[in-house]
Amino acid sequence: MTLELQGVSRSVEGRVHIHPTDLVFRGGTMNVLLGPTLAGKTSLMRLMVGLDQPTTGRILWDGADVTGQRVQDRGVAMVYQQFINYPGLTVYENIASPLRILRRPRAEIDARVREIAAMLRLTPML
């Protein structure tokens, strides 16, 4: 699988967050985004997963243009360095949240939550 950014940029209210950028990420390789605070690493990641839309350029997933595609339809997610959860929700609800957004069947959600909880040794907390 390949993720490609072609001339991708992002500006908000006239302020440039990401200058035009070309990148290729190939499956089976390790890629690292390094830079100081406010360099645009998170902004770039948000563009790649579809949380934000680029001002210019295209984002290709295995050659298919996904630039305007809804984040729910991309089948990708971003894992943050610091765990982000919803403190008002139970462990079960936190794990189930993305699956509910994708409108998965209740039985599938339950099975997947239990599988993930077991992998993370969180079953007693369900």
Regions found by a protein language model. Give the residues of each.
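Conserved beta-strand
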Residues: 5-8, 16-26, 57
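Conserved ABC ATPase "signature" region
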Residues: 100, 107-125
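ABC ATPase NBD coupling module
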Residues: 64-78, 101, 106-110
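Conserved coupling/switch loops of ABC nucleotide-binding domains, chiefly the family-specific signature
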Residues: 55-58, 108
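The feature captures the beta-strand-to-loop junction immediately N-terminal to the Walker
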Residues: 34-36
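Short coil-to-helix segment of the ABC ATPase nucleotide-binding domain corresponding to the Q-loop/switch region
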Residues: 89-98
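Conserved ABC transporter NBD signature motif
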Residues: 57-65
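Helix-to-loop junction immediately C-terminal to a conserved catalytic motif
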Residues: 49
